[in-house]
Amino acid sequence: MFWELFVENIKIISTNEKDTNIKDFLLQHGLTATLIKKVKYGGVSINGTTVTMRAVVSPGDEVLIILPDDVSEGIPSIDMPLDIVYEDEYMIAVNKPQNMPTHPSKGNSLPTLANGIMAYFNGNHTFRSINRLDRDTSGIVLMAKDAFSAAALSSSMKRGEFRKKYIAKVAGIFKNKHGVIDAPIRRESEGEMKRIVAPDGKNAVTEYTVIRDDGQNSLVEILLHTGRTHQIRVHFAYIGHPLVGDFLYGERIENKCYNLHCFELSLPHPKTKERITIKAKCEFDL
């Protein structure tokens, strides 16, 4: 278990071919403006000498960054079994069960995945979820262990470098076993949770392949090309195949929630930049 992360020291050797302002250098290496503010005073040194943000990094210089790591407040530790599908020094991925919120929020009852993670790290941790799943969606939730990794992973996800695959149980039988849903999504109205397909929405693309059907419902594998809120649920309802049991976009089934599982996540590693693939077993079928 890796949990002794109170301060993160990051050492970078400059491979730039010319002198670079220290702030630009840090931005080039994945630090956000917020993180740079944290290390502004006394948190950066070049070749062993503490410097200010006016300093210049020359080719071959050794830059040391000290990032203070805070502990999440207000998230109590609650012991629970965790299905850890990946862990190293920089991040941890858990197969979140169905009917569990990712983190505490208004309207979300305890326990949440965040409570379990805090217990896993003995309370000495900042909860940094990179992707989030709805309460009723199961599967891979990725969390960074330090501020630098969180910034690198979040930037990578914003650049579209994450590939997320899901399995879902949807209503009806498909004529075509493979398809792409390209339909923009926006909120139904201001302040509403529900989303709809609309011409003035944000670009949203979902690719799917039918695995099998039982004559009434179908099991589909889904690849997200974008990451809009409720994208899978909205898109499959839009084409007439809502998720079975989806109370918001389909037909409510008493004492049953929809089946949607994130079973694969592919991404560049925040430190090595090598592409890794994380998988989590799906517990449901037709």
Give a label for each model feature.
Residues 76-79, 198-206, 259-260:
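Short coil-to-beta-strand transition motifs
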Residues 1-39, 212-217, 225-286:
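Pseudouridine synthases involved in rRNA/tRNA modification
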Residues 84, 170, 207-210, 243:
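Conserved hydrophobic positions within beta-strands
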Residues 48-50, 209, 215-223:
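Short histidine-centered loop motifs in beta-beta connectors
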Residues 132-135, 200, 212-214:
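A short beta-turn/loop motif at secondary-structure boundaries
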Residues 2-180, 186:
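RNA pseudouridine synthases
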Residues 52-56, 221, 257:
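Short, surface-exposed secondary-structure edge patches
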